[in-house]
Amino acid sequence: MYSSSNSFLGGANSTRPGQQPYMQQQPPFSQFGQQQPQNQQTGLAPQPTGYNPQFSALGASQLQPQATGFPPGQIQPQYTGFPGVSPQPQQTQPTGFPASPQQTQYGGFPSLGQAPQIQVTSNTNIPLRTGQQTSSEIANSFQNASVATPTPPPKASGGKIPNIRLSFITAQDQAKFEQLFKSAVGDSQAMTGDKAKELLLRSKLPGSDLSRIWVLSDTTKSGQLLFPEFALAMYLCNLRITGRDIPSVLPETIKNEVSSMVDIISFQVPDTQPEPVAKTNVPSFDAPLLENKLAPPAPQQPRPQQPSNSQLLSQLTAQPTGFPPSSGYQANVAVQGQNQGLVPQATVFPGQASSQNLQPPQMGILNNPQPTGYTGPRPPMPPMPTGFGSNLSPSQTGGLVAQPTGIPGQWGFVNAPASGLPNIEALKQQLMPQPGREGGFSAAGLSGNASIPWAITKEEKKIYDDLFRAWDGLHKGFIGGDTAIEIMGQSGLARNDLEAIWTLADPHNRGRLNMDEFAVAMHLIYRKLNGYPVPNRLPPELIPPSTRNLNDSIGTIKSMLSQDAEHRKATGAFLQPQKTGVSYLKEHSFRGGAVSPGAGRKDATLFKNNDEAAAGYRSSARRRVGNSGRTPSPAASQASEEELSVEQLKKKIRETQIMLDAVDFEDENRAEEEDALDRRDRREAESLMDRIRRVQDDIDTHPHAALRSLDTGAERRTLRRQLQAYEDQVPQIASEVRRVEREIAEAKLELFRLKDAKAHPNSALNIVGTGPGGAVTEADRIKARARARMQARAAELAGRPAPASQDDEEAATRRLEGENARVKAEREKNDSMTRDVEESVKEFARSLEDSLKEGEESSTREHERRRWEDALGVEDVIRDFIYDLNRGSRTAHIRKEEDSRGSSLEPRSRESSAHTSTAARPSPPASVGLTGASPVTHEDRVAAARERAQRRIAERMAAAGLKPQTDAIETLAQRQERERREREERVKRAEEEDAKREQERQRRIAEEQRTPSTQAAKPAGKKPPPAPPRGSRKGRTDSTGQADAKKAAEGSAKTEQLALEQALKEEQQAQEEETKRLETEAKQREDEFAREQQEQEARLRALEEQVRQGKIKKQEEKRRREEAKKAAQEQEARLARQRAELEAAKERERQLQLELEGLDESSSDEEGPVDIATPQDSTPTQSQVLPATSDPEPPAPPTPVAEPPTVPEPEQTTASSSPESSRAVSLRLSPETESKNPYFRRNVSQPTDYPPPTPPEVPQVSSTQMPDTQSTNPFHRLAQQQQPPPPPPTQPAFTGSAPLARKTRARPEADDDWSAAESDFESSDDEDDRAGGGSAKQLASILFGTMAPPRPLSAMDTQSPSSKSATPVQGSSIPPVPPIPAEIEPSSVADGASPPPPPPPPPPPPPAAAPPPLPSAESPAGIPPPPPPPMAPPAPPPPPGPPAAAPAGAPDRSALLASIQAGKGLRKVQTNDRSTSTSAGRVL
């Protein structure tokens, strides 16, 4: 009666899937499985209810297929409750358990204790690569020649490369790479390490570069290369061949493209499954599980400890059946983890605990189907036992949850463990916003044992939604990156995992998560905490419904449009859409139904103008009476009109005319009244506007108008901050007051003690206390009493009267206590006063704060302010009026500022003129004495300068939009008024002083002008008479004394007049200079103020921009760009400086050649030209030590060897690497500006400086990438083999090894585009060419040949312009000459010179150095003068200049010059000073 049920997965008679089909024969069962079922019998064939055994994979060909139970892919056939043919029901049946004294086992559990079980792990979606080398071994094979050939991997079927374009290579290159890849791998999907090595070695690149390329290319670390990885390796080889550097880390875009294509290829590789079996009539349950082929597999859980048989007997539940064969599932988790599509199997009727009550099956020759087992009426499906024994009770199927009823990928329909999701409530409590959430988080308690599917259950979704709502307090509908960092950071996961989870949860790169995306992120975190890896791609089950529905809607719309266009094109409806008569409205539905709610409605495609339906004019249609529709039918009105006579109609017309006239009259009266009201309102509005204008003018012209602040909100906030600052100071001041009061009280007590001790010398109060706080202890009293007794005894012995009777201790204590009480009372009174002041200050501050809060702008007030001040939402007239008022206010404000600036500048100019006139006065003591009583003192000038400084500061603050600090004692208006009065007084005094000074100066000038004229007139009339006596005094015998005296007097008068004129000129010049100086200072001050103001404005703008954007990253980028630009500018300046030095060196060279010509003329025969040959190879290169093969030098005394300058080489390295570092910086910054992942931003916000890779550092890079572990790079050992020996330790002088190494690598060979260093590989490749791999190698050689740059160029020449100078071309140009330090002897100078000088000229001194002094006569012969001191550190060498040919016919001069450079002394320097080279050194 249940045979027609199709409710479970479409199988006939499948309502009870564990039971055999009704009225059909059960296949025979044998103990050892030797009898095969008779699949073809006459009549009805036996229908097995299980699956045919898949013997080919597990080697169980001798076993019989079981009727029900688990598939035999992993367990042995088992019997399900019937003894079958076997007459021994007590024998052990092969049901999966080992042989034991137990009864016949009918359950469906496998033998978990058997040894020969084959466990196939879950598929990793990557081609199985068994029996081959690892990536590390392949990497080592590139460094080691002797490596065993690995066994080839099993070839996967179908080597199809996905049709996906890689953006980092061109389409032509990708096609070439695909051809090369296919020719190399054949039908396989992956290229082995050896094959990749053979192909990549044809690039002729060094092993270090190939090692780094392999590290970057082998993204899966599997020792093989899929096509995208191979294309990436070829791309990196192309980069290195063309001279560019290999990046240390792949860019994000390239890495994402390669990993995505690798995943696609991996998903296309089929799982390793057993061979298919013969087709049977068993229903197939594979289809629902194979619908979603691209979904990642269900996560495989770590295998728990296998239970024993007794534990299995106590834990047995209903047995599921119908499980599809799969190679990736384990039998011990089938009940909880693999129960999709399974129902409990009833193997024995309840109550029939043993098999004796069951009917044995009738098997064999009968044609009719025989019932087996229980033959009674078929009951409903109750919970059934599994037939183990009578002690077992019927087990419920509570371990299984609801079956999936939705489509795959639908949220909320998924099987979860019956015991609930492990520790997800703990995760929810951990991630809820709560105090102390900044602490650490431990994932130790979140490790569950349940196998969680990819999809999110309803319970999980509810928990995640609660978390989202708890964190989304403002109900924005999303959670930003910062909040997500705080939430997800509490999970304790690594930042890389959180970054990957964010990338999966935020597919649109919005930088925030909505509710569904947040649920995805939380689910991935939960799975990661339970030990499952984060997937590379978001599984289809985890795609949020919002995103999926949106994509489906877009696809539906596109399909609708395309189908509509195709339909109209096919039917010809697009030609005349108005005549088709087909409504497309009902077809445009997202629900897919043929009839939509709007189907009865007509759209524009069905519109047709119906002229016949147009009705005539109906007067009743003019007006509607309320909401009751039209007036009564016009038929009645027509009948009534026909009954009226003409007179009646005329009467009605007259009455209607009268009524219309009355209505018109009323309308005219109403219009007149409205006009009158409008005129009155207009007049009132104009009067109000006039009043408003006057009030605004009064406000603008008021002296305190500058104090008016339109930004009341900002001012209110400023006042509130000031009030808060003052409130914060109140407790501190109160504590200071209390401390002072306490000190005053202590001082009063101490003073009272001193006074009391003076008044009562013998009092006990005179005791000095040594206790804490000066308290008098008992020991102090004992000492005082002993001292008093000693004093009395001393007085008695001395015969003095005994001291007065001591005051008792009680009296002293009473006096002290009284004073203490008085001081304490006064202190308490003051303390209470302080508390009162504090409370009053708090109340006052509270009232002020309340008043400030009351004045805050509400929404209504803000609306009103924007309406009446910003003219938003008002009429045009009012808006124009408001704009006019604003313009008038701004004009008045600007005019007032100009007036105030002019008035402030005028006194300043007067003061400056006053100072100018004061400074311009002559400085004789008499003039100072005349103006000694000046009212402008030094204090006044200091005050004026301070005022000017304060005014400038205030102006700058006002220009910057800041408010000056107001004085707490007086208001701003009072202070301005006081300063204005003081300024006016100072201006008045300055004007008076200027007037007095000017009068004094005019008077003095007039007197000085009169004095020379009188003095010039006096010698003519008065001086000659006294002259003879003076002459007679000097020489009385001289007859011409009078004439001489007269001439002397005239000469003295002229001299005095000239002296006066000179003094006047000097005074005028001094005045002019002083005036210019003051003007210059004033101009400098103004320029400084303008510059400071500009800088302040620039800083303010920068701060505002930073606050508005909040992106510190842009500043960092700007700083880097500026540094790069600055470095480039410095490099240009350095090059220009070097060119200038080169020109100076050439000029100096010419001078030295002239000196050498003179030297040759003056030299003797014995010191003739020394034949010294300077071969090319011995010419010192850049920072290179001269080789030992040079000509011997003359013996010289031993001198200390000084280190040559080692500056040019590091600078050159920096200069050459600066473009590469800037390029690397730009490369690292490009993806950062695109991604909004907050973890990625946090990683990138911490700058990482990557050193630019240089050729000597390549082995170090490769070694640091693979520490302590076996390298997976196939090029590692090749790099070690090809690596040159390490350079020797750095000597005091630079050697030329590094530049020469660069030169050999940079130069292209004559006949080939590749370096000849790897020529042996080509010969070995030719020997190893085979039929299978020859074409691939030839293609690789062709490809790498096309990658090479043009032949005249080289890889190192294209890196940077400054690197060209690092490779010297010998004999082609004049290299620069560095400056010579003072402490270096000539030989060391020659050794340490950075660039090689050409044979003719010697190294000249630096151009900025002064020439050394010539040797004096006292200097010993043969000692050259010392070289000039170095003026600047040596610069890096500039690019080589044009070739300069040596002077023809001057080989002797060259040889002599070389000897001079080597330190040879000249003998005849005392005869010819020009013979000594200024660049030669002196032995110290």
Swiss-Prot record:
Which residue intervals are annotated with compositional bias (Basic and acidic residues) in the record?
811-866, 894-913, 937-955, 975-1010, 1063-1152
Q: Which residues form a coiled coil?
A: 635-760, 807-843, 965-1011, 1052-1165
Name where it's found.
Cell membrane; Endosome membrane; Cytoplasm, Cytoskeleton, Actin patch
The Gene Ontology terms for molecular function here are:
actin binding; calcium ion binding
The UniProt entry lists the main location of this chain as membrane
EF-hand domain residues? 205-240, 493-528
Q: Where is this region: Disordered?
A: 1-100, 289-331, 351-384, 615-643, 793-866, 893-1484
Q: Which UniProt keywords apply?
A: Actin-binding, Cell membrane, Coiled coil, Cytoplasm, Cytoskeleton, Endocytosis, Endosome, Membrane, Repeat
List where Low complexity composition bias occurs.
17-47, 306-316, 1209-1222, 1382-1393
Repeat is among the record's keywords: yes
Q: Where is the EH domain?
A: 173-261, 460-549
Give the quaternary structure.
Component of the PAN1 actin cytoskeleton-regulatory complex.
Q: What is this protein called?
A: Actin cytoskeleton-regulatory complex protein pan1
